[in-house]
From Swiss-Prot:
The lineage of its organism: Viruses, Duplodnaviria, Heunggongvirae, Peploviricota, Herviviricetes. The gene is U24. Late-budding domains (L domains) are short sequence motifs essential for viral particle budding. They recruit proteins of the host ESCRT machinery (Endosomal Sorting Complex Required for Transport) or ESCRT-associated proteins. Contains one L domain: a PPXY motif which is involved in the interaction with Itch, a member of the Nedd4 family. This is U24 protein. The modification Phosphothreonine is found at T6. One of its GO terms (cellular component) is membrane. Keywords: Membrane, Phosphoprotein, Transmembrane, Transmembrane helix. Interacts with host ITCH; this interaction probably mediates ITCH degradation. Interacts probably with NEDD4. It is found in: Membrane.
Amino acid sequence: MDPPRTPPPSYSEVLMMDVMCGQVSPHVINDTSFVECIPPPQSRPAWNLWNNRRKTFSFLVLTGLAIAMILFIVFVLYVFHVNRQRR
C-alpha cells in the first residue's frame, strides 16, 4: 500500500502562486489568453476601484433587501392588526 499522496495543485492554483511570486511559469507562456487576463501592475488601482464598486453595490442591494423585508413584515402585522380590530 502506497501512502496517500496529496493531489497535484490545479492549473489556477499554480497560476495564482506564480502571479503572487511575480513570475509566470513556462507552462503558461504557451497559453497567452490566460496571461492577458492578469492585470499588469500599473492597472491595479482600476481593479481596486472596481472591487470597491462591487462592494458598495452588494452593500446597497443587501440594505435594500433588508429594508424591503422589514417593510413587508410591518405591512403584514398592520393588516393582521386591522383585521383583528374589525371583529
